[in-house]
Curated annotation (Swiss-Prot):
GO terms for biological process, alphabetical: angiogenesis; B cell receptor signaling pathway; cell migration; cell projection assembly; DNA damage response; integrin-mediated signaling pathway; lamellipodium assembly; neutrophil chemotaxis
Zinc finger feature spans (Phorbol-ester/DAG-type): 513-562
Annotated transmembrane regions: none
Cross-referenced SUPFAM superfamilies: Calponin-homology domain, CH-domain (SSF47576), DBL homology domain (DH-domain) (SSF48065), PH domain-like (SSF50729), SH2 domain (SSF55550), SH3-domain (SSF50044)
Gene deletion effect: Mutant mice exhibit increased bone density, due to diminished bone resorption, including following parathyroid hormone treatment. This phenotype is due to defective terminal osteoclast differentiation. They also show a delayed wound repair program, characterized by a deficit in macrophage emigration to the wound, a reduced myofibroblast-dependent wound contraction and a diminished neovascularization in the restoration tissue.
Record gene name: Vav3
Spans annotated as Sufficient for interaction with ROS1: 560-847
UniProtKB keywords: Angiogenesis, Guanine-nucleotide releasing factor, Metal-binding, Phosphoprotein, Repeat, SH2 domain, SH3 domain, Zinc, Zinc-finger
Domain Calponin-homology (CH): 1-119
Tissue/organ expression: Abundantly expressed in osteoclasts and mature osteoblasts. Also expressed in bone marrow macrophages (at protein level):.
Chain ranges of the SH2 domain: 672-766
Protein name in UniProt: Guanine nucleotide exchange factor VAV3
The UniProt record lists the keyword Phosphoprotein: yes
Amino acid sequence: MEPWKQCAQWLIHSKVLPPNHRVTWDSAQVFDLAQTLRDGVLLCQLLNNLRPHSINLKEINLRPQMSQFLCLKNIRTFLAACCDTFGMRKSELFEAFDLFDVRDFGKVIETLSRLSRTPIALATGIRPFPTEESINDEDIYKGLPDLIDETRVEDEEDLYDCVYGEDEGGEVYEDLMKAEEAQQPKSQENDIRSCCLAEIRQTEEKYTETLESIEKYFMAPLKRFLTAAEFDSVFINIPDLVKVHRSLMQEIHDSIVNKDDQNLYQVFINYKERLVIYGQYCSGVESAISNLDYISKTKEDVKLKLEECSKRANNGKFTLRDLLVVPMQRVLKYHLLLQELVKHTHDPMEKANLKLALDAMKDLAQYVNEVKRDNETLREIKQFQLSIENLNQPVLLFGRPQGDGEIRITTLDKHTKQERHIFLFDLAVIVCKRKGDNYEMKEIIDLQQYKIANNPTTDKENKKWSYGFYLIHTQGQNGLEFYCKTKDLKKKWLEQFEMALSNIRPDYADSNFHDFKMHTFTRVTSCRVCQMLLRGTFYQGYLCFKCGAKAHKECLGRVDNCGRVNSVEQGPFKPPEKRTNGLRRASRQVDPGLPKMQVIRNYTGTPAPGLHEGPPLHIQAGDTVELLRGDAHSVFWQGRNLASGEVGFFPSDAVKPSPCVPKPVDYSCQPWYAGPMERLQAETELINRVNSTYLVRHRTKESGEYAISIKYNNEAKHIKILTRDGFFHIAENRKFKSLMELVEYYKHHSLKEGFRTLDTTLQFPYKEPEQPAGQRGNRTGNSLLSPKVLGIAIARYDFCARDMRELSLLKGDMVKIYTKMSANGWWRGEVNGRVGWFPSTYVEEDE
C-alpha cells in the first residue's frame, strides 16, 4: 500500500478523518488527501486528538476558506506545536508551502510518519505508519501543484464536525435545565403542548435561578478581590440580564398559569427589544473567560475564592467558567422552544400569533449568532493587522475580508509585472510584498473609486500568470491590471471583487432618491423595511445619509421614498426638528413610507403657503410628487416634484395617491445576471466560453427591458425578453410571472420553443467557473459527489450574500439543505445550482 494511503488510514484511526472519507474509495488519488489537508485545520485537530490542548483551537482559523494567509498560519501553528509539544526537530518537518502549494507532498507524508512514531503518538495505542514495505513513488506527487491550481476548492463541511464538536457549555446548560419529572402531576391534560409550555416556564425559572446564583455566590464575594476593570471584564452585563429575566420569568409564569397562555406570544414579542443586550454579553464572553483564566493563574487568592464560591453555589459541580457560557446557550433556545410549541398548537389564531413570537426570537437568535460570527471575523482581521508591516490604518475600517492570495500587478502605463500578495476587503485592497512569514504594505487601493473589467484577450495565452482583469479608476486616474495564476483563479478573484463592489454600491442604493452607504451602527438597530435586526457588530447594514433610514442590503429596493434631501452631508444623522403652528396642532414628520402622490390639478403658487412653511411647489396635473412632510390636518404638504426635482409646498387637495409600484427585484446575486450591458460587451464575455454559456442583461437602450445572450454553435446569440401586462416571455405561447421563473424554465427546456434554430437549454451561467474539458464530469465527479440532502426548506425572506461563501435567497426559493451547523445558526444548501451558507432563521423546513 502506498505511503499516502497508509497515512490516510492513520488519520482515520486518529479520528481526524471519517471512516468513509473519499480517500478510502477505490477511485481515490493522492490529490484527494492533499486537498483535504491543505488548509491546516485537520492537522491542528490531529495534534489535539493525540494530546488534548496541544493547540488552542480558538487561535487557529477553523474555516479559512482557502485564504492563503489563514491556511499558512494554521500550517505554521501545526509545525510549531510539533516542535514545542511533540519534540520533533525542525529538520524533520516540511515547510508551510510544501503543503499549501503541494510542492513537496512527499515531505508532508514523511513528517506525518515521523509524528506517528513520537512517544506521545505511540502512547495513544494507534499503530504508526508505514506498517508495511512500500515503494515510495515520487512521480505520483509531481503533478499535484498543477492539479491543485486547476481544481476549484469546495468545502468538505462534514470534515469539520469533529473540530467543532458540541456547542461549548451545552452539557452544562442541559444539566442545569433538567426538569424534575417526579414533581410533574400526571394527568390526561398533560399532553405534548402542555409539556412544551411547562418546559418554557420551568427552564426560564431555572435559568433565572442560575443568573441569580452567579450574582449572589460569585459577583458579591469576588468584588473585593478584583479590580473594577477585572470585575467588569469577567461579569460583563450580568446584572442587566438578571433584571430582565426576573421580569420575563414572572410574565411567562403569569401567562401560562393564570391566563391560559393566551398572551404568551405578546410576552416574547415585547421582550425581544430588551433581550438584545445579549449582543453585548456574547461579544464579551470569550474575553471574559480568557480574563478569568488569566486572573486565576496569576492571583492565588482569587483562585481559592473561586473554588469556595463554587462549593457554596452548587457543591462545586459547576465552576464560574462553566456558568459564564450558559447565557449564550439560553438565548439561542427560545426560538427552538417556541418552534416546538407552534408545531403542537392547532388553533389557527393561536398558531398565527405564536408564529409572530417565533419570528421575533429567531431574529434575536440570528442577531446573537452574527455577533459571534463577527467576533471570529474580527480575530482574523487582527491577525492581518499584526502581520502587515507599515500598515498604520485600522484594517477594521475596510470592512469584512473577501479573500487574499498571490497575484501579479502592473499599472496601465507600465508593463512590468510585480509579484504581490493582496488582501481584499469590502472597501479596500491592501497590496503587500511578502517578507518571510509577514508582509510589507506597499499600497492601499480605495475600492470606492474603482470598477472592474474583464480582459478576455489574456485568456487566449493559456499559460500561468497570464489571466488578467482591470481595476479602472472612475475619475480617469491611472488604473491597474491584475494577473492570476490560472483561469479558475481569475474567475474566483473577479467574483470576489464583484462581491466587494456590490457591497459598496449595491443595487437600489440610490433608489427613491436615497443615498445608502455601508455603515457601522454603534447601537442595536432594526431595518426600516422588514423590522428585523441589523446583524453583527460592524458594517451591519446600510444608512441613508440624506434621511437616516437604515436597512439590510436585501431590503434596499423596498425602502420607501427618502424623507429629506441633503440633510446628512457629514457625520451622524440628526432627525429633523418638528415645526409648530399656533393655529393648529403641531405637524408631525410624515413617515417616508407614504406613497408617491399623483397631481390632479395645476398649482402655480396661489394661494401661497404660510410664512412659516416655505416656497410653493409648482405642479401640473399628471406630475408625480414625492411626499416629504405633511399630515391629515395640514392644508399644505411638502414634496418633491419628480419631473423638475424642485422641493416646496403645495395644497394637500391637489394630489391623490399614486398606484402602488411593485417592489424591484434584485438579481445581482444570480450567477447569470450581468446588469446593464450592451450586445458587444456580452459577446466579449461569451467569446471564450463553451457553447450554452449564457447571461441575462439589462438592455441599456431600453429601460426596464432584458435580453438573454447565449453562446451557440460558437457564436453569441441575443434574445429579447418581452414584458407585457406584468409577464415575461420570449415566445407568445409561454409567459412567466418573473424573470427568475423564465430562466429556471429554459434551464430544462430548449429555446427552440421560441427560436427554431436555437436548440439548446441555458446550461452554464457566465459567472460560474468553467472547468477544463478534460476534467468536466471527471475530477469533480471523483472528488465532489452530490452531497446528501438533509431536508428541503422554503425561504421566508430575501437574503443577499455579503461574500462568496454565502448563498443569496429570494422569498419563496426552495432550498436543498446539505449541512446544519447549529453552532453558529448557519446552514449550507443549494438553490438553482448555487451552493453556499445562509441563515437558518431565514427558511422554514418542510415537515
